[in-house]
Design a protein with these regions (language model features):
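Bacterial N-terminal signal peptides
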Residues: 6-16
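Short, surface-exposed ligand- or partner-binding patches at beta-edge/loop junctions that are enriched
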Residues: 91
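Positively charged n-region of N-terminal signal peptides that target proteins for export
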Residues: 1-4
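Rhodanese-like catalytic fold shared by cysteine-dependent sulfurtransferases
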Residues: 18-37, 48-87, 98-142
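Short hydrophobic beta-strand that contains or immediately precedes a catalytic carboxylate
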Residues: 41-45
Length: 142
């Protein structure tokens, strides 16, 4: 129950600010190109079950969004070495979780948070990482 309340609070915070879209977004190919060039750190916020099911983008950090806001914040800080100005691109299944996480991280002082809005499976924003046949790494032990 406590976990559900924390997630609800995390999701409500950006909505209270009245901002329906935090922006900026990246397409899956642009996120892949930027991550490959070392210009952005890609972070997959899906569940371990989803990582095992499809694999993950090469070199992506992994943080389970459903573990709550404290875990999200501390894990992202660890991934970027504490640098809230480091460019990060968040990816989930369809862009829904990343939209909420993007707003939350921006509210926590992160300045360069991108949303891969088409996600892994696709959305109205685009066909997604999987259908675009972008590279994946197996994550059998996730």
């Amino acid at each position: 129950m406590k976990k559900l309340l924390m997630i609800t609070a995390m999701l409500a915070l950006p909505l209270a600010a009245g901002d329906s879209h935090a922006g900026p977004d990246l397409s899956a190919p642009d996120a892949f190109a930027a991550a490959s060039a070392g210009k952005v750190r890609l972070i997959d916020i899906r569940t371990p079950q989803e990582w095992r099911q499809t694999g993950v983008a090469p070199g992506a950090g992994r943080v389970d969004f459903h573990r709550g806001p404290e875990v999200l914040l501390s894990s992202v800080l660890q991934i970027v070495g504490g640098d809230r100005n480091a460019p990060i691109a968040l990816i989930c299944r369809t862009g829904n979780r990343t939209s909420h996480a993007q707003k939350f991280l921006q509210a926590q002082g992160f300045t360069r948070v991108y949303n891969v809005s088409e996600g892994m499976a696709g959305s109205a924003a685009g066909p997604g990482w999987l259908k675009r046949e972008l590279p994946l790494e197996s994550c059998a032990q996730c």
